[in-house]
């Protein structure tokens, strides 16, 4: 496919990146530590660590893994923590020691955790004590030999830390009881590591850095094998994209999305650590009052989120009290941002939501809107530098400009494959190195892409293709709607019919009122046949609404 999108690039943005700049993620972070040593790196609950401090602690942790646990190169180490100061220390330490990090959602059920630990073959895990009880339930059935337990208070000094841990454990009772023999505290690991001499491990771009498990929105989670080169490439692609708008050592970034998710890991951790930014870690973004309170403490310049987070924010009166005078960039990804939400965000903050698109298998960034847009575009923008895309029909042939087709991607950010799944890898990546995304998109004559929907979410009503994103976009415009999801359900007359799940913003909303609203905005076959009101909708760890779960629930009724 001709690279039409290059003509639409922002002035000064190069079409290719130089991947040879870095040999590994450890190389990236080492250079940041040297260049921005005394600058604040990570802040959490009022405690700040400089780049030099994080670098020292990460090396201490790497030394513990290397000298005390004696883990061989390539061994898998799981991380089961939310956004706390120990997360970047553990991640950079694991990678520095030549090991492979396995990001694990701390909110996993025992079944989900067991699958991931067994599938990855992890032998060591770093877990925040709040979630150790889940680990205890599955531990005997995994290959885990070493358990390192972190606590929220341990990074805050002896007196303050002890007080914090007492409140968390005894007053708020946020640490369920667990019994795991022979655990080591994170602080002990750091001390024992510091007492030994770390021997640097030479890494290459082809070495595996992460086993990043797909979000489970498409079934059983698979481990995407992401190399140091994959992550470094995506970081450089993004850095090239943002260079006209953001400046080294001067940005303050909110990290509300979990760092164990690839979107936050690459964007929040890699890109902004590489540019010497101050990264404010939000441990529990569901505590919206506390989150907004954190935003009020100091002006931020970058906000990264997903539609559900933006939606929750703009519907809080206290969000308008935040100082947005320094906000330069709001980056949206993970799911489609709805226009109604984007318009409210722009009205309150003064900055548009810049929509990006990616997937775990691409580290994750594939496309992004230019940062100089004036308003939300409704599309996913342009392929980032050194990235090729093709839109194909069901027979694998390229579709004409303006016609919907499945998006395929090729670039240095595309994964090596799925962990221990050669057949799945062969299905996902073709002989030319293009990755199948499973997403339907349309490209215009200037190379701009608009995502239509997931191929698997397509609903066929009386032979007509209906994309649930379009229906959700329309329903979300209604002022009485807070959240919405659309699925297809079996129907004798039409094959499938549309069912919409809605969380009300205004309790007076009725089904009849909403159907009438849809009739005024949609052609007849796109009007939902059934509306179900819910108190909440099922979501993934980053807030993506899980249509698959809603389909399963509808089938079981």
Model-derived segments and their meaning:
Residues 20-21, 38-72, 78-84, 88-92, ...:
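Conserved AMP-binding/adenylate-forming core of the ANL superfamily
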Residues 382-386, 397-428, 466:
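Conserved ATP/PPi-binding loop(s) of AMP-dependent carboxylate-activating enzymes
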Residues 7, 138-205:
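ANL superfamily adenylate-forming
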Residues 75-76, 82-102, 106-110, 118-124, ...:
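A short helix-loop-beta submotif of the ANL/AMP-binding
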Residues 277, 297-304, 314-375, 388:
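Gly/Ser/Thr-rich phosphate-binding loop
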Residues 68-71, 193-206, 211-255, 277:
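Conserved adenylate-forming
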Residues 232-252, 262-301, 316:
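Conserved AMP-binding/adenylation subdomain of ANL enzymes
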Residues 125-129, 411, 416-417, 424-427, ...:
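AMP-binding/adenylate-forming catalytic core of the ANL superfamily
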């Amino acid at each position: 496919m001709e690279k039409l999108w290059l003509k639409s690039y922002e002035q000064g943005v190069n079409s290719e990146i130089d991947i040879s700049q870095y040999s590994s993620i450890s190389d990236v972070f080492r250079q940041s530590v040297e260049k921005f040593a005394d600058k604040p790196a990570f802040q959490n609950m009022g405690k700040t660590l400089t780049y030099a401090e994080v670098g020292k602690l990460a090396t201490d942790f790497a030394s513990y893994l290397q000298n005390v646990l004696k883990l061989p190169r390539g061994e898998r180490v799981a991380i089961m923590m939310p956004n706390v100061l120990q997360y970047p220390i553990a991640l950079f330490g694991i990678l520095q020691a030549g090991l492979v990090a396995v990001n694990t959602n701390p909110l996993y059920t025992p079944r989900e955790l067991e699958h991931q630990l067994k599938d990855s073959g992890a032998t060591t895990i770093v877990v925040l004590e709040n979630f150790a009880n889940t680990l205890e339930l599955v531990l005997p059935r995994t290959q885990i030999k070493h358990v390192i337990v972190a606590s929220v208070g341990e990074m805050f000094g002896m007196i303050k830390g002890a007080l914090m841990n007492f409140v968390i454990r005894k007053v708020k009772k946020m640490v369920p009881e667990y019994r795991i023999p022979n655990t080591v505290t994170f602080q002990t690991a750091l001390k024992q590591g510091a007492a030994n001499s770390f021997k640097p491990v030479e890494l290459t771009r082809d070495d595996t850095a992460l086993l990043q498990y797909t979000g489970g929105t498409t079934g059983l989670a698979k481990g995407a094998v992401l190399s140091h080169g994959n992550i470094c490439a995506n970081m450089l692609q993004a850095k090239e994209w943002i260079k006209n708008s953001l400046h080294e050592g001067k940005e303050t970034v909110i990290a509300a999305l979990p760092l164990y998710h690839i979107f936050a890991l690459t964007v929040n951790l890699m890109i902004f650590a590489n540019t010497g930014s101050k990264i404010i870690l939000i441990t529990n973004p569901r505590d919206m009052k506390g989150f907004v309170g954190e935003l009020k403490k100091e002006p931020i310049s970058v906000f990264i989120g997903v539609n559900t987070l933006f939606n929750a924010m703009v519907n809080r009166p206290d969000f308008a009290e935040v100082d947005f005078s320094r906000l330069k960039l709001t980056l949206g990804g993970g799911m489609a941002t709805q226009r109604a939400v984007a318009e409210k965000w722009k009205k309150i903050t003064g900055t548009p939501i810049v929509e990006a698109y990616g997937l775990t298998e691409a580290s994750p960034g594939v496309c992004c809107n230019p940062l100089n847009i004036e308003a939300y575009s409704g599309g996913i923008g342009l392929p980032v530098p050194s990235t090729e895309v093709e839109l194909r029909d069901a027979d694998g042939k390229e579709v004409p400009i303006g016609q919907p087709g499945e998006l395929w991607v090729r670039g240095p950010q595309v994964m090596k494959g799925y962990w221990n799944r050669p057949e799945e890898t062969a299905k996902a990546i073709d002989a030319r190195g293009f990755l199948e995304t499973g997403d339907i998109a349309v490209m215009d004559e200037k190379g701009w892409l608009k995502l239509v929907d997931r191929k698997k979410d397509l609903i066929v009503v009386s032979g007509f293709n209906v994309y649930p994103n379009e229906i959700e976009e329309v329903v979300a415009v209604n002022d009485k709607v807070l959240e919405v999801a659309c699925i297809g359900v079996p129907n004798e007359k039409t094959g499938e019919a549309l069912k919409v799940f809605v969380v009300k913003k205004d309790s007076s909303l009725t089904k009849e009122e909403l159907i009438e609203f849809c009739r005024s905005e949609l052609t007849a076959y796109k009007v939902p046949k059934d509306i179900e009101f819910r108190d909440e909708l099922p979501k993934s760890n980053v807030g993506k609404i899980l249509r698959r779960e809603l389909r399963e629930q509808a089938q079981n009724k």
